[in-house]
Amino acid sequence: MLKAFDSKADVQAAPLPPAKAGNKKAQRNEPQFNPRTECYRILGVDLTSVPGFASPTVLVLLCELGPEFAEKFATAKHFGSWLGLCPDNRITGGKVYSVKTRDVKSRVAEALRLGAQSLCQAKNYFGDLYRRWKARLGSPKAITAMAHKLARVLWHLLEYKQPFNPEVFAKEEAKLQRKKLQRLHTMAESLNYRIIPIQ
């Protein structure tokens, strides 16, 4: 079935780098082909390089949405709203009545939620962000918020056909660390203390 899709990447001329080795054991019902390579050939972007996106998740996205789905949504916000992952703000007369997400039955949204949940122990920007949201919002809301972020990342990668660049998020993490350090210095000064870095 996947062979019927047109190729957007030449896997012979530009092969994928080897997948990271993990502790996952081989499953009995694993496909007899390389889903990572096939999805890369069809989509033109290696989505498995995004934290939280394993080959089964990408296969679900491809089967449910097709290879050209990014063109069907004007912006990443439209895509997130269609999935029911963003808040459905109901405001009347300046009063907020509800900010809950809409009840949307979508296999894609469920796949993104599973991908978000897999980041609970990830040692990267997405894992740190998920744990911060979980501490502040609780697990269900943190999973939905992270799934929404993954959906936006997914749309941008497929819309602009650009590979995932972790350095973009590394800059965000460095910016957050600077803000944390500034808050610590401010708190220490308010208590007549001074923070000295360890040499």
Segments (PLM) and residue ranges:
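A detector of single, family-specific signature residues
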Residues: 1-199
